[in-house]
Swiss-Prot record:
<feature type="binding site">
    <location>
        <position position="301"/>
    </location>
    <ligand>
        <name>Mn(2+) 2</name>
    </ligand>
</feature>
<keyword id="KW-0031">Aminopeptidase</keyword>
<dbReference type="InterPro" id="IPR043472">
    <property type="entry name" value="Macro_dom-like"/>
</dbReference>
<feature type="active site">
    <location>
        <position position="364"/>
    </location>
</feature>
<keyword id="KW-0645">Protease</keyword>
<feature type="binding site">
    <location>
        <position position="362"/>
    </location>
    <ligand>
        <name>Mn(2+) 2</name>
    </ligand>
</feature>
<comment type="function">
    <text>Presumably involved in the processing and regular turnover of intracellular proteins. Catalyzes the removal of unsubstituted N-terminal amino acids from various peptides.</text>
</comment>
<feature type="binding site">
    <location>
        <position position="283"/>
    </location>
    <ligand>
        <name>Mn(2+) 2</name>
    </ligand>
</feature>
<keyword id="KW-0378">Hydrolase</keyword>
<protein>
    <recommendedName>
        <fullName>Probable cytosol aminopeptidase</fullName>
        <ecNumber>3.4.11.1</ecNumber>
        <ecNumber>3.4.11.10</ecNumber>
    </recommendedName>
</protein>
<feature type="binding site">
    <location>
        <position position="278"/>
    </location>
    <ligand>
        <name>Mn(2+) 2</name>
    </ligand>
</feature>
<keyword id="KW-0464">Manganese</keyword>
<feature type="binding site">
    <location>
        <position position="283"/>
    </location>
    <ligand>
        <name>Mn(2+) 1</name>
    </ligand>
</feature>
<comment type="similarity">
    <text>Belongs to the peptidase M17 family.</text>
</comment>
<feature type="binding site">
    <location>
        <position position="360"/>
    </location>
    <ligand>
        <name>Mn(2+) 1</name>
    </ligand>
</feature>
<dbReference type="GO" id="GO:0030145">
    <property type="term" value="F:manganese ion binding"/>
</dbReference>
<keyword id="KW-0963">Cytoplasm</keyword>
């Protein structure tokens, strides 16, 4: 999909101007008001009052979530005109803007329109600028246009031939915003590319997306963007004494991998931001076996790994001026005659011992060794990303990512990035009292703390391995993928993480 930006002055958009431009569809937003402005007013003038008549008749009132598709409108070069309701102007928030974009895309999906002029970017949400409107439009349009099977046709012998979808989108902006809009469009495309990589990795079946596949993906990113990559195998992992990580790998024949991918866009002496992604490419639960129903979705248990690789790809494409390192411990969690058993005690890389009370609480075991490993980078901040607990879904559903952090500054920066990118999070507690639930009679700690506050105790477990740097934990179990008819990876939290890094880079 190709995006471009163009400065348009709708006051000068007569029959020989912008309205005369040829396209498959001209998309125009209309507020819930009798007053017309911008592209809507220009259209009304060019069509001798058509828009005003539609409003007066009640055929289109500009209400949120509504649209009206017009064909072969006299005085307009586009084959179609799509009017999109924006609701009340005073209530045109960032969420209302996103709803308008999605409303337009739903209407367009029922047409063969491929080349579109998109004017909604000249109506940014309240308290947002044109750059935000452009970046958000690009990411939402690309997100809606994602088709996994079209990207991986080898997985189906027979496919429906859609033959449709947007191909070219021209985003209109005011002249004063033209330069910022062009940059924003490029950044939106980079974020969309990162999200699509993340979604591809999550959606691939686990017999294809193995730990080795993830390692090769990191190598390809490094090759494409001239980054540094290192992949450690089992012997190197053993030499580092990552006993917790190795305990999870024991039941599988797939070799574990420990991936370190470096983007060096900042000064050499600048402390890096480290992103650590949980990479369980398939999670049976191990000896603490999961129920069979829905187990196929456990291929998504590596979405933390996928999201940090997708984020690093986006950062590299944008060329942000900061240093970022992605670290991915990746393996399968399988039962076998030599798999780790409930009650086994292992020694982590940190030297702390762990009683493995439940082998299905494996994500924290591979992460804790990775969190110890990253101390060597003397990081400015470490953010781990994991589909860690079902309990966070009970707490937050599928809307907000769970955000845990000791530092208010880091937590607030992540929450602000989530709000700005429409990839929202909600801060969860890390009170010291929760640590009591992790006590063990036979080791320094257990790997679970029981059902109460289970997402919190999982984060508290990780906190024990992060004392030497500023740290945050994102539990994406509720936001990384969807079930049911819309089953598939979402690409979250790539927008949140990328915006956080954009804000940090300045």
């Amino acid at each position: 999909m190709e995006f471009s930006t163009k400065a348009l002055d709708w006051a000068k958009a007569g029959p020989s101007g912008a309205l005369a431009a040829k396209s498959d569809c001209l998309v125009i937003g209309l507020f819930e008001s009798q007053t017309l402005a911008g592209a809507a007013k220009a259209l009304d003038v060019a069509t001798k009052g058509l828009v005003g008549r539609l409003v007066k008749l009640g055929d289109f009132e500009g209400k949120r979530g509504t649209s009206l598709l017009l064909h072969e409108v006299a005085g307009v070069g586009a084959a179609r005109v799509l009017l999109v309701g924006l609701g009340k102007e005073a209530e045109f928030t960032d969420r209302a803007y996103a709803e308008a974009v999605r409303t337009a895309l739903r209407a367009l999906s029922g047409t063969k329109a491929a080349n579109v002029t998109w004017t909604l970017t000249q109506q940014p949400a309240r308290d947002k600028d044109a750059a935000w409107a452009v970046l958000t439009a690009v990411t939402l349009i690309r997100e809606a246009g994602y088709r996994f099977i079209e990207r991986h046709p080898e997985l189906k012998s027979k496919r429906d031939k859609s033959g449709g979808g947007l191909r070219k989108v021209m985003l209109t902006v005011d002249a004063a915003d033209a330069k910022a809009a062009a940059v924003a469009a490029a950044r939106g495309a980079a974020i969309a590319n990162g999200m699509e990589l993340t979604r591809d990795l999550g959606n691939l079946p686990s017999n294809i997306c193995t730990p080795t596949y993830l390692a090769n993906t990191a190598r390809q990113i490094a090759k494409d963007f001239k980054l540094k990559v290192e992949v450690l195998g089992r012997k190197q992992i053993e030499a580092l004494k990552m006993g917790a990580f190795l305990a999870v790998t024991k039941g599988s024949q797939e070799p574990p991998q420990f991936i370190v991918l470096r983007y060096e866009g900042g000064p050499a002496k600048q402390a890096p931001v480290v992103l650590v992604g949980k990479g369980i490419t398939f999670d049976t639960g191990g000896i603490s076996l999961k129920p069979g129903e829905g187990m196929d979705e456990m291929k998504f248990d590596m979405c933390g790994a996928a999201s940090v690789l997708g984020t690093l790809r986006a950062v590299a494409e944008m060329g942000l001026k900061l240093n970022v390192i992605a670290v991915v411990p990746t393996c399968e969690n399988m039962p076998s005659g030599i798999a780790t058993k409930p009650g086994d005690v292992v020694t982590s890389m940190s030297g702390q011992t762990i009683e493995i009370l439940n082998t299905d609480a494996e994500g924290r075991l591979i992460l804790c060794d990775a969190l110890t490993y990253v101390e060597r980078f003397r990081p400015a901040a470490v953010i781990d990303v994991a589909t860690l607990t079902g309990a966070v879904i009970i707490a937050l559903g599928h809307i907000n990512t769970g955000v845990y952090a000791r530092s208010d500054a880091l937590a607030n920066a992540l929450l602000a990035a989530g709000k700005q990118s429409l990839d929202t999070g909600w801060r969860m507690p890390l009170d010291e009292e929760y640590q009591e639930l992790l006590k063990s009679n036979f080791a320094d700690m257990g790997n679970i703390g029981g059902r109460p506050a289970a997402s919190v105790t999982a984060a508290c477990f990780l906190a024990r391995f992060t004392e030497k740097y500023d740290w945050a934990h994102l539990d994406i179990a509720g936001t990384a993928w969807k079930s049911g008819a819309a089953k598939g990876a979402t690409g979250r939290p790539v927008p949140l993480l990328t915006r956080f890094l954009m804000d940090r880079a300045g």
